[in-house]
Swiss-Prot record:
The keyword Nucleus applies. Residues 50-220 bind DNA. Residues 355-364, 376-385 have a biased composition (Polar residues). The gene is TBXT. In the developing embryo, expressed in the mesenchyme founder cells, vegetal plate of the mesenchyme blastula, extending tip of the invaginating archenteron and, later, in the secondary mesenchyme cells. Involved in the transcriptional regulation of genes required for mesoderm differentiation. The keyword Nucleus applies. Residues 355-385 are annotated as: Disordered. This is T-box transcription factor T homolog. GO terms for biological process: cell fate specification; heart morphogenesis; mesoderm formation; positive regulation of DNA-templated transcription. GO terms for molecular function: DNA-binding transcription factor activity, RNA polymerase II-specific; RNA polymerase II cis-regulatory region sequence-specific DNA binding.
Length: 434
């Protein structure tokens, strides 16, 4: 067989670029037509009946500087996507008309030309991008989108107040060799609303209250909780073991600390422990004492106190009559620095670190004796007691720290046991109160 030359084996050379261009053009036209698997794409609005109730009254949505979430929450069910293709779902808001609206005599009427259009912002669903199977397995919920009247940051959509908007859901196919492609945009007339900074229609307000009890625009949860706590406090006071206690001890004005429920109980302490058990002893009586520089909640270090302390308290209550308050001028320093039982450490007056007691007052003072103790009593106890016997506010003894070391003596231990505070609030947990 005769050998073939190299030229005969070489493939024929001619230009095929026009063929490649033709194939690319066909692919582009097919992409514009859409994937055959997406021909049956459907998007259905959830909670249609609820949206219709608001739409009938002209729905309103609050916009704030920091952003406010929508109610009703926009949610839609998607069907007809390619389960194996990647999609992103977006939300934006288009102007429903060319009016600025105003609320007059119980109805919304056009109020002039619209303001300039705000910068177009779209909210990308946090699950984007994802497979079509993911978007179709459950409703797509836009509960995290926030409406704002200022352009602040991600997760917020800027709208003009007193303008009507219509939410639009966009589905975009992403990934693969083809470029991003809009599959479809969907909107629903029932979801139209007017952006407001405060609800105008009382009927809309009532619907919001009925179906969304956590809406902040019309229901102040904090005030509601405060009123509930106050009721609990009064109930506890009526069944208190010490009904003779007045507003001087745990005043409602917070002279010795805020209300027991002011701080979030996230520290893990039981609400009934320690001084918090006396949360119901507050009354309407105005506190005669100035508040400390830092308000504290009552301590949870202990649940009860001994018989001696109880007797000491009961015997001292008689000193708190209104006519004895005239002596406050001579005991201002003692009263103002008297610490509250606190669940926070290192909050005891600095004078307690050098003197055995923390401002024990005399019988002429409106403050009862024997309420507080210090874990390091010293020989300066007698000095403080002697000074207060003459109506003077106790002061630090000035002894060096080396001399204040008698905490283990039997005499000091016995003396400290007789001055337990209600709830046994320990000075070791409250050292350094300023």
């Amino acid at each position: 067989m005769p050998a073939m030359s190299a030229d005969a084996l070489r493939a024929p050379s001619y230009n095929v670029s026009h063929l490649l261009n033709a194939v690319q053009s066909e692919m582009n036209r097919g992409s514009e037509k859409g994937d055959p698997s997406e021909e049956g794409l459907k998007v259905r609005l959830d909670d249609v009946e609820l949206w219709k109730k608001f739409h009938k009254l002209t729905n309103e949505m609050i916009v704030t500087k920091s952003g406010r979430r929508m109610f009703p929450v926009l949610s839609a069910s998607i069907a007809g996507l390619d389960p194996n293709s990647m999609y992103s779902v977006l939300l934006d808001f288009s102007a429903a008309d060319d009016h600025r609206w105003k609320y007059v005599n119980g109805e919304w009427i056009p109020g002039g030309k619209p303001d300039g259009s705000p910068p177009t912002t779209a909210y990308i669903h946090p699950d984007s991008p994802n497979f079509g199977a993911h978007w179709m397995k459950q409703a797509v919920n836009f509960s995290k989108v926030k409406l704002s009247n200022k352009l602040n940051g991600s997760g917020q959509v800027m709208l003009n107040s007193l303008h009507k908007y219509e939410p639009r859901i966009h589905i975009i196919r992403v990934g693969g060799r083809e470029k991003q492609r809009l599959v479809g945009s969907y909107s629903f007339t029932e979801t139209r609303f007017i952006a407001v900074t405060a609800y105008q229609n009382e009927d809309i307000t009532q619907l919001k209250i009925k179906y969304n009890p956590f809406a902040k625009a019309f229901l102040d949860i904090k005030d509601k909780n405060d009123g509930h706590d106050l009721f609990d406090d009064v109930h506890d006071f009526q069944g208190s073991k010490y009904p003779q206690f007045g507003g001087w001890f745990l005043p409602g004005s917070g002279a010795f600390g805020p209300t027991p429920h002011q701080f979030n109980p996230s520290i893990g302490l039981p609400s009934h422990a320690g001084c918090d058990r006396y949360g119901g002893l507050r009354s309407h009586r105005t506190s005669p004492y100035p508040p400390p520089p830092y308000h504290q909640k009552y301590s949870a270090a202990g649940a009860g106190y001994g018989a001696e302390a109880s007797a000491g308290l009961s015997s001292s209550i008689s000193l708190l009559a209104a006519d004895s308050w005239s002596s406050l001028a001579n005991s201002t320093s003692a009263a103002s620095s008297m610490p509250a039982c606190s669940q926070y450490g290192s909050m005891w007056p600095s004078t307690a670190a050098t003197s055995g007691f923390s401002h024990v007052s005399s019988p002429q003072s409106p403050l009862p004796t024997g309420l507080f103790r210090n874990p390091h009593p010293t020989s300066s106890h007698q000095h403080n007691l002697a000074s207060t016997a003459h109506g003077m506010a106790p002061v630090a003894s000035g002894l060096p720290s080396a001399a204040v070391t008698t905490a283990n003596s039997s005499e000091a231990h016995a003396l400290s046991q007789s001055v337990m505070a209600p709830g046994e609030c320990r000075a070791s947990d409250n050292a350094g109160y300023l």
